[in-house]
Amino acid sequence: MGPEKFARAKPHINIGTIGHVDHGKTTFTAAITATLANDGESFAKAYSDIDGAPEERARGITINTAHVEYQTRDRHYAHVDCPGHADYVKNMITGAAQMDGAILVVSAADGPMPQTREHILLAKQVGVPHIVVFLNKQDQVDDDELLELVELEVRELLSTYDFPGDDIPICPGSRLQAIEAISSNPTLKRGDNPWVDKIYALMDAVDAYIPTPERDVEKTFLMAIEDVFSITGRGTVATGRIERGVIKVVDNVEIVGIGDTKTTTITGIEMFQKTLEEGFAGDNVGILLRGVTRENIERGMVLAKPGTITPHTNFESEVYVLTKEEGGRHTPFFTGYSPIFYVITTDVTGSIDQFTADDGSIVEMVMPGDRIKMTAELIYPVAIEEGMRFVIREGGRTIGAGVVSKIVK
């Protein structure tokens, strides 16, 4: 018997956790799923389930590393955990680009860390529209005034990066206390335990504060490929979030970017081990492709309706260059500068050929804090189009964020 069908009964929201690695993001996700499971809305996920990818792959077309699903009374959530290792920022950029909102996890015992600042900044750059804060480790803070102080610090930090710091819900709690309470009594319901209730309060805030986005279902289908793997006897699977449009089994799609463009047919679509007849904008899906080998396709390519997007190397863009205080460069850069461009799920080196100031004059040098028009050339072709956002990085730091304004070639 194949996987069950996915029931589209509630609005689907993509959410994620961001924050300092040691502030307990992953066990925090386990706390949410375990809590909501007792509301009859979700299945509990153990910590090992959330951080483990290879075992999941044996079960069908599954989604990258740590996509977990859960439901509240009003919504269906896909939750992406940005992994906390060397690839963190790369995954944060691709993961955050898929988020309709994020839960920022901050330790109430430690307050905001240097990474917290970078993660809020990245969330702003890649366009995470809404943030709710979970102040973890409340059980380690005896002093209410200290808790208020940390809350104030977090609000100020969010306001610094143009999030509405005064309005954002901040929910204190302890993911460890919640998990321990549920482990010792798996039947705990809302109202039975103060620590578990704090997780409910957080998800109530997420339900209320993060709006249901309008999905681009009218536009032509596009999905950036986040991961690729093979299933013996079934073929090759590409996973990612559908950026726009609708896709059905047996539709033809093009694989665009990096190498030559290829056409293939979709033979299956799944979300969380459940089959879909069609995938909609906003869905995190695995798409099974006919006649495609693992060598033909890689992260950074896109699947698209045939003839709707083409690979390019040269484009004009409008870019904001971060200041030193925002975590950017301390010094100017010049034409010929070759940073890394993060476009949807791709990271590719490019050289900057020309800078143009707002008045149309050509400039040789760009300072941190400048807003500038620039022409860039990537070392290999990537599926890009006007209006696409990107982030520019070098040496482990974000130095700018921009939008493609014109395709040159």
From Swiss-Prot:
Gene: tufA
Protein's name in the database: Elongation factor Tu, chloroplastic
PANTHER family, per database record: ELONGATION FACTOR TU, MITOCHONDRIAL, ELONGATION FACTOR TU-RELATED
HAMAP family: EF_Tu_B
Record InterPro entries: EF-Tu_GTPase, EFTu-like_2, EFTU_2, G_TR_CS, P-loop_NTPase, Small_GTP-bd, T_Tr_GTP-bd_dom, Transl_B-barrel_sf
EC number: 3.6.5.3
The species this protein was found in: Stephanocyclus meneghinianus
GO MF assignments: GTP binding; GTPase activity; translation elongation factor activity
Annotated residues for binding of Mg(2+): 26
Phylogenetic classification of the source organism: Eukaryota, Sar, Stramenopiles, Ochrophyta, Bacillariophyta
Region G5, annotated ranges: 174-176
